[in-house]
């Protein structure tokens, strides 16, 4: 059920329209006081898995993005909490990327040429290198064709890593890793044993590159019931 109606307000942001219902959040396009378009995610805190929060109760997706600044990572704008119908919700405001996901691209074009794959992959690797070499390294955990957007607002498309819902700090316990809802076709073997690392992200990028080149992931048998 859509929680925010058109023209309703969240802090300094006015809702323009509902975008989609995700596994853990709803997303909207909003405008700030200056009239700039932004992307807002709304989280029902009571429905999020406990592994989505740090030891102080802060939502990890917000904590990680707030301190991440890189041209190949979606830009953090603001965050906070609101009450809707006596329930606490967290919101995260991000830049609104004018473009499409790699999944959208494949739906239209079926596959991508090798030069574009090489150039886009270099940019994504730069973003991952930034995350993996932070003082407190971060693992994204969900690099897929759905979670890379091409920013088409300039002369040259710029790939940007989005959706940090499964991102974790590398030094966290494996007990904080919850792979429920992840696409198993992109997961490294160790992830099925609840171990995640920077190498897991590189593996997922390799699967993404294969998918872009051939139009299918390297394996696509029915493993959705694997536990």
Q: Can you annotate each of these PLM segments?
A:
Residues 85-101:
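Conserved short submotifs of the Hanks-type protein kinase catalytic core
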Residues 102-112:
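AlphaC helix of the protein kinase catalytic domain
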Residues 201:
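Conserved catalytic-loop aspartate of Hanks-type protein kinases
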């Amino acid at each position: 059920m859509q929680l925010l109606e058109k023209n309703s307000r969240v802090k300094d942001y006015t809702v323009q329209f509902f975008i989609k219902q995700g596994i853990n959040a709803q997303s909207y396009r909003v405008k700030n006081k200056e009239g700039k378009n932004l992307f807002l995610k709304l989280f029902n805190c009571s429905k999020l898995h406990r592994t989505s929060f740090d030891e102080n109760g802060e939502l990890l997706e917000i904590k990680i993005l707030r301190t991440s600044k890189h041209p190949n990572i979606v830009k953090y704008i603001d965050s906070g909490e609101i009450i809707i119908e006596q329930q606490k919700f967290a919101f995260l405001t991000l830049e609104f990327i004018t473009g499409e996901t790699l999944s959208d691209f494949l739906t239209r074009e079926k596959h991508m040429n090798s030069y574009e794959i090489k150039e886009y992959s270099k940019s994504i690797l730069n973003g991952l290198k930034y995350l993996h070499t932070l003082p407190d390294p971060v693992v994204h955990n969900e690099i897929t064709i759905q979670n890379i957007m091409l920013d088409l607002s300039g002369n040259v498309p710029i790939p940007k890593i989005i959706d940090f819902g499964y991102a974790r700090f590398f030094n966290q316990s494996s007990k904080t890793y919850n792979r429920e809802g992840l696409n198993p076709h992109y997961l490294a073997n160790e992830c099925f044993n609840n171990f995640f690392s920077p190498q897991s992200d590189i593996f997922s990028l390799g699967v993404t590159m294969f998918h872009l080149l051939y139009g299918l992931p390297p394996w696509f048998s029915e493993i959705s019931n694997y536990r």
